[in-house]
Every structure is written in structure tokens, then in C-alpha cells.
């Protein structure tokens, strides 16, 4: 189990120098069921378990399309896409990521392709930008807990309740609280940056995380695995869709919508300007936005929807979209500030200073 303090020694280096290599992505090939006529190369920071139902459903409409799906962590996807853009290579036809601030930067740097259709135009305004980035999911950040380790009276439903729990029962929950490593996880950093917006309690919560010896991981799958096995008791700011998926696969976890405010993102897609197969990329994008694609995503992949009710497994208001709790991450130029290097370093330093008061601040 890699703990938060293990990242302190390397964060300054990671923030100060460029990464020369991108970790190899895991590529899965979905052969064309009707015989291959073309190949679509999709690169995503989205779990294969979420993408596979959508890919196979799309192939019922496009049986002659072979789809190659390459899965990354968010920062590696950003680095690889940026490199292809700068070098004008063409191995990526469609890019999907929950770290929408990174996609905004790529589009702002001229890496995207313009596309407009009746399906893109009907999207909520906060989920699209410049006809180049398109959000296709509705995913809240949630609190997840292990049902065997956290009794009902301890389940936190607000950040104040989580703070008070860590203060009142430090021995019980020391080393048992997990969240994203914001130095490695693009979505973790994005969620933290939104937590920092006008949230007076954030500093106290981070200090409590430090006293509780916060455990950090790069990825949702690692955090959910530790929550399922009992290595962790509570996970903070996890992507709700992945948590529901883990629970439906048998993980003995509970899922809570925070009642003070709920950050919600729309996982987004964009088509690189160097795509070799724009027509099929546009087709797959329209599928993701279509009624059929949205229905399949709600049933098999992401479980939440823009207008629907909460999944029955989730503790929260039935109609989340009208609950008044939402703090949506608007896809647009304001996200460029999240990628500003100086602001990023300040947030990383504040995070580490608060959680490691006796350690070195990068």
C-alpha cells in the first residue's frame, strides 16, 4: 500500500521537469463482427469495463469497423496526445478522458478537429466547447466506504462529517482513508482544484487527512479494490460511476452523494486534428451522444444520467440534477487556469503542506 508520504520526495521533480516517455497503454482489439473495412483507434482514460459495452453496441451499427481501444491513466494520455499533436503524428482517431481540463488545453493548443451535428448541438452548454470537446456522461464525485469497516453511525455525508469522524476516531481510521494522488492523477487534481474554490473547510480536511495518514493511488480501480478488500475504509472524491460498477460486480461498498456540495463532471471526447479516420470518429462520437448510446451507457457503463434518477445503490437525493447540490465542471476556457503551471504548483504545495506539516514541501 503506497501512502501519501511516499510521493513527497518525487513531486517536486515531476512538477519541474518534462516526462520524456509515456507509459505504454494497454490496447485491446475488438474485431469487426461483419468483416473489417476500416479501423478506429480510440485512446481513453476510461476503464475498459466501462468502454467495452459501448464499443460492442456501436459495432451492431457499424459491423465492418474494427476498434482498437488503448487505455491510459489521465496524465499519460495527455502527454501522449500532446506529443502526437506537436509531432503531427496520426495514431489517435478519438480521445476520451475524465480530466476535461487537459482536453481543454489540447484544444486550446490547436490539437482538435471541429465537428457539429444535431447531437452535439443538443448537449447542455456546460458540456461542450468550440465544437471540439463534447461531454457524454454525467458523473458525480462521491464518498465510498467499506460496509464491514464503517458502521452506519460513522458514514459521512458531508465534508464536515468526514472531518469530525477523523478527529473523533483517529486510531480507527488511521491509514484507512484513500483518495487520488493528485500529482499523478489528472482527475484527482481536477477534483482537488474544484474543492479549493471557495471551500473554507478544505484546509482543515487536508490537515485531517495528514493526521490520518492518507493513502493515495493513481487510479479509481486501485482505490476501489482496496475499499473492497478492506485495506481502506473510506474513499474521498471517487468517480461515482466506477464505484457503482464495482458494487454491481460484488464489492461490499456503500456510495454517498455529499450533501454539502457535489462536484460533477462530464467525461469528454475530442477528435485529434491528425486523425486518420475522421468519418468513423464522427460516427462513434455521435453514437456516444445518441439516445441509444446514452441508454447503453446508463445501463452498463456510467449508470448516472443528465436527467434520470440516482442509481438505487447510491445514498443521495433521488433527482440529483435538481437537488441544488451540484457544482458542475464546466468545459470551457476557464479550465485553462487549472492547467496553469504556477497555480498547479501552488495547489500541490498547499496539499502537501497541509497533509504533511513536518515534511518537505515541493
Task: List each model region and its residues.
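Paired acidic/hydrophobic, glycine-rich loop segments that form the ligand-binding mouth/hinge
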Residues: 88-97, 216, 233-238, 254-255
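Conserved C-terminal helix/tail region of periplasmic/extracytoplasmic solute-binding proteins
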Residues: 328-362
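A bilobed periplasmic-binding-protein/Venus flytrap-type ligand-binding module shared by bacterial periplasmic
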Residues: 142-149, 191-193, 265-277, 296-297
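Mature extracytoplasmic/periplasmic domains
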Residues: 272-331
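Early extracytoplasmic/lumenal segment of secretory-pathway proteins
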Residues: 24-104
